[in-house]
């Protein structure tokens, strides 16, 4: 009987440890991503080395490799958080918004610029070509639905157009991206002599969608 009890206790302890390990792994994985999110917000993309992320997370320099086989995997996990944040902000301004498609698209574009200017480090990381091209962790699966929201709104504003809505939406997005970057660098405020980005936003929409009906 004593031997049986000992074996039972040992088996129970092993099972308990096995159950704890995935939880601990998930917790450390999340801690590494959170450290990266905080680091990119504070110091920018250039600070996101594996060594620095590990230091911020309070783990050994080799720990990230256990959960993220490559640097791109970890950067992609951090970028996914950025896309999730942008998607949440987009949903917040569009859900329950009963305005016209043009008004909804204006709100979407404004949200995009606000995100780019308030989170410049994350914004730069999210649209890095190497991350999107590699599609680590299905990163494109989190970014493309946001673009589709833009395409759908363009299609409602200009239902019969050539080029098609996806091309118009792509040109509009490219224009907004350029405005965000040049404004963030200080080039556009200097060139326009204004600290108000709203006229540029409206001019961009007019250029791609036509003047708004008054």
Regions found by a protein language model. Give the residues of each.
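Solvent-exposed, amphipathic alpha-helical segments
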Residues: 35-42, 85-96, 175-182
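Amphipathic alpha-helical packing segments from all-alpha helical-bundle domains
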Residues: 134-159, 166-170, 195-207
């Amino acid at each position: 009987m004593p031997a049986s009890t000992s074996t039972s206790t040992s088996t129970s302890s092993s099972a308990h440890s096995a159950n704890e390990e995935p939880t601990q792994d998930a917790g450390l994985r999340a801690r590494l991503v959170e450290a990266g999110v905080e680091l990119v917000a504070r110091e920018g993309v250039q600070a996101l080395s594996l060594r620095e992320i590990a230091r911020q997370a309070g783990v050994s320099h080799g720990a990230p490799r256990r959960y993220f086989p490559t640097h791109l995997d970890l950067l992609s996990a951090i970028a996914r958080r950025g896309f999730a944040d942008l998607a949440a902000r987009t949903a917040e301004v569009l859900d329950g918004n009963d305005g016209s498609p043009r008004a909804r698209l204006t709100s979407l574009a404004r949200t995009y610029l606000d995100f780019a200017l308030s989170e410049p480090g994350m914004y730069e990381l999210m649209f890095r070509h190497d991350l999107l091209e590699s599609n680590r962790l299905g990163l494109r699966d989190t970014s493309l639905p946001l673009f589709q929201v833009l395409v759908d709104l363009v299609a409602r504003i200009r239902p019969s157009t050539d080029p098609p809505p996806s091309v118009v939406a792509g040109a509009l997005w490219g224009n907004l991206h350029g405005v965000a970057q040049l404004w963030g660098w200080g080039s556009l405020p200097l060139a326009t002599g204004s600290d108000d980005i709203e006229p540029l936003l409206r001019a961009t929409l007019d250029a791609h969608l036509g003047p708004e009906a008054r």
